């Protein structure tokens, strides 16, 4: 049954003459009146290398859409660079920006009654923020990301942003070596080149089904990235017509992002050792979609999903461009499907089932298409380059080695345990998260005395100042969603632990969170957080912390009675919190619920 266009409220009828005059002043032609108005939700900014190249691409998408008879209108969201905001109070704003992005998209699309969306995202909070908005709005939507940065190279070794951060705090590394790494770590536009939060989310968007194959892995500089944008433009017109002309609701975000799709996405995340931030974001997106998806589901999946892909920061051997050469996200999904670990009946935004997509896009499938082979042959250009789609390098040979290559089959998994795990215990009754793919197996069981800090800044000073020694468990409290507020990423403390050559000799736990660039025994999202009365806020220096990843437990060696009787440790830090962040703190949930806003 035909659906009424949302935009008809401002384009149809005599009394809408004023609105039509304004649409005409925006460039709408008479023959576009009464056709779907498609919002191009861009996120261009010159503050973020993952978005610096998106300035003109929105207009390319607009031109492609308008060739097909619809009207397209572009607007922008904010975008914060977590790497630049890291290590100072700017990081307090990062996670809250996710909700502002979601709100701004909802505001613009609903205020102007757009009928469909193309979401051009890329970096850490932008993709989940736009996904949250897509679930709220539930209109035809296609996602296409700006693509990953190429890996840097120095002295024949691949490197990235995290190398620059670690080496700069290592006194044994010369100033010249640090300068060389700095100059080569981030050679192109795009989101940082490892399986950090941005790339993790763009990869998961393929598994959720709202993005096309290659979305998460084709480098930003490659000509095939531009083709993805062109394909997204054509697809959104097709899907808008399916919905409004034919009443086909299968193209709607909530029809695609079902519970099974979220389970598939989380299974992929565990299999590829993605960022722990994805746990927060998938929980939040599912909340907006009205899908029953919780920490217990993640725990369940983590116990049966092996690690099939290791990429920086979990190894320096591979970066995202290597995942693309091995067949991209579809290749990992294909291996998971062989083991019955995902549901391949789910539908995708391109109209195919996941099973059909695997058949056409898996590079080991006998039915793989030429288009798929071209996508996954997209190579790095290996030169400094800030222009989207400006190079055409192709691999001559793809990585189909599932025994020793970048992507493994189930028989040759990197580990039987997946890349993420949920731990529970008297420190974290509601759970906490660790990226096991980044933890050396020698410290999967770890016991040591606590060294407690009530801020990221104090922890950094303690680590660099020698207060933290081999065998310690660094505990950073009052950095959760409420306590920060804003749930800062602890990338600098974890990097400094490595700089001090303690990466296999210390652990870190916090009610804050971690960058996707973090590795090591780093346990975050402790819930309930200290600011909500959680037991992490009662730990004092010298308390013995016991971590057991195989058993999925984390405890302080105190009885329930001792913990109940112990008061919360006073907060000694001096931190200015502006009203905007106080407002966020007043309604944000705990990390185990995705740090979503709780509004009656």
Swiss-Prot record:
Listed GO CC annotations: cytosol
Binding site for Mg(2+): 82, 124-125, 489
Identification of the protein by name: Dihydroxy-acid dehydratase
Keyword entries, A-Z: 2Fe-2S, Amino-acid biosynthesis, Branched-chain amino acid biosynthesis, Iron, Iron-sulfur, Lyase, Magnesium, Metal-binding
Enzyme class: lyase
Residue positions binding [2Fe-2S] cluster: 123, 192
General function of this protein: Functions in the biosynthesis of branched-chain amino acids. Catalyzes the dehydration of (2R,3R)-2,3-dihydroxy-3-methylpentanoate (2,3-dihydroxy-3-methylvalerate) into 2-oxo-3-methylpentanoate (2-oxo-3-methylvalerate) and of (2R)-2,3-dihydroxy-3-methylbutanoate (2,3-dihydroxyisovalerate) into 2-oxo-3-methylbutanoate (2-oxoisovalerate), the penultimate precursor to L-isoleucine and L-valine, respectively.
GO molecular function: 2 iron, 2 sulfur cluster binding; dihydroxy-acid dehydratase activity; hydro-lyase activity; magnesium ion binding
UniProt subunit comment: Homodimer.
GO biological process: isoleucine biosynthetic process; L-valine biosynthetic process
Family: Belongs to the IlvD/Edd family.
